[in-house]
Swiss-Prot record:
Expressed predominantly in the testes and 17 day embryos (corresponding to prophase I in females). Weakly or not expressed in other tissues. Pathway: Protein modification; protein ubiquitination. Its main location: nucleus. Ubiquitin E3 ligase that acts as a limiting factor for crossing-over during meiosis: required during zygonema to limit the colocalization of RNF212 with MutS-gamma-associated recombination sites and thereby establish early differentiation of crossover and non-crossover sites. Later, it is directed by MutL-gamma to stably accumulate at designated crossover sites. Probably promotes the dissociation of RNF212 and MutS-gamma to allow the progression of recombination and the implementation of the final steps of crossing over. Its EC number is 2.3.2.27. Disruption phenotype: Both male and female mice are sterile. Males do not make sperm and have much smaller testes, a characteristic of mutants with meiotic defects. Early stages of meiosis occur normally and full synapsis of homologous chromosomes (homologs) is achieved. However, crossover-specific recombination complexes do not assemble and crossing-overs fail. In spermatocytes, chromosomes fail to congress properly at the metaphase plate, leading to arrest and apoptosis before the first meiotic division. This is E3 ubiquitin-protein ligase CCNB1IP1. Interacts with CCNB1, UBE2L3 and NF2. It catalyses: S-ubiquitinyl-[E2 ubiquitin-conjugating enzyme]-L-cysteine + [acceptor protein]-L-lysine = [E2 ubiquitin-conjugating enzyme]-L-cysteine + N(6)-ubiquitinyl-[acceptor protein]-L-lysine. The keyword Zinc-finger applies.
């Protein structure tokens, strides 16, 4: 990049605009825009905003036109000796070169600062990415383990559901059986309750054949022997019934059969004999 392609910028730190029109040039080789130059150099003594140098000389601050007219360029150096013209030109070129060099240093400093900041941010983000990757790997492992646990629970739930359904079917079956037996017992009990209490049918007792319609009347039971004999006979109690079967222990369902219930009712009304 040639020097002519570079544009001078205002050396005021907060400004940094490209200069055009008029500018304020200082003896310490700094240049400012017309706005900040007129504002900063109106105080006495004037101090350079860029390097804080005191500008007390008459020509330490010059307001110059950056694009002079052709008439001005034709007359400003007229009559000067060549060495003076060259000296003025060399100083003007040195000022321009200094400004361009300082601007490049400033841009390189900003670039280096931004690059360092970018590296720090990149390093920080890489650390965060690594940390997040570790967390992500850990979470993936946890998800896999939780999926395995979930599958195990699903399998257990399915097995338990099948067992529960089987238990429900067994319960419904047993409940139906219980209801039918209960209804049957209620029907038998109601039929037996309708029989006459004084007349009890006997079957196969004291030599009477089964199906015999003879009935014992409780009013004709003999009390004792009135005529006397070798021995005095007195009726002793005994039960004319079948022996009662022992009740089953620890049985889930125990139902009495109808014949057993009828036999128990007959036993409750059995004859009692007394031997004298």
């Amino acid at each position: 990049m040639s020097l002519c392609e570079d544009m001078l910028l205002c050396n005021y730190r907060k400004c940094r605009i490209k200069l055009s029109g008029y500018a304020w040039v200082t003896a310490c080789s700094h240049i400012f825009c017309d706005q900040h130059g007129s504002g900063e150099f109106s105080r006495s003594p004037a101090i350079c905003p860029a390097c804080n140098s005191t500008l007390s000389g008459k020509l330490d601050i010059v307001r110059t036109e950056l694009s002079p007219s052709e008439e001005y360029k034709a007359m400003v150096l007229a009559g000067l000796r060549p060495e003076v013209v060259l000296d003025i030109s060399s100083r003007a070129l040195a000022f321009w070169t200094y400004q361009v060099h300082q601007e490049r240093l400033y841009q390189e400093y900003n670039f280096s600062k931004a690059e360092n900041h970018l590296k720090q941010m990149e390093k920080m983000y890489m650390q965060q990415i690594q940390s997040k990757n570790i967390e992500l790997t850990s979470m993936k492992g946890e998800v896999i383990s939780m999926k395995k646990v979930l599958e195990e629970y699903k399998k257990k739930f399915s097995d338990i559901s099948e067992k529960l359904m089987e238990r429900n079917r067994q319960y419904q079956k047993l409940q139906g059986l219980y209801d039918s037996l209960r209804l049957r017992n209620i029907t038998i009990a109601s039929q037996e309750g309708s029989l006459e209490p004084g007349m009890i049918p006997q079957s196969g007792v004291f030599g009477f054949p089964p199906g015999n319609n003879s009935k014992f009347s409780l009013d004709h039971i003999p009390v004792g022997n009135q005529g006397g004999g070798d021995e005095d006979v007195q009726f002793r109690p005994f039960f004319v019934c079948s022996p009662t079967a022992p009740e089953p222990i620890n049985n889930f369902f125990s139902f009495a059969s109808p014949s057993h219930e009828a036999e128990q009712q007959v036993c409750s009304r059995a004859f009692k004999a007394k031997r004298i």
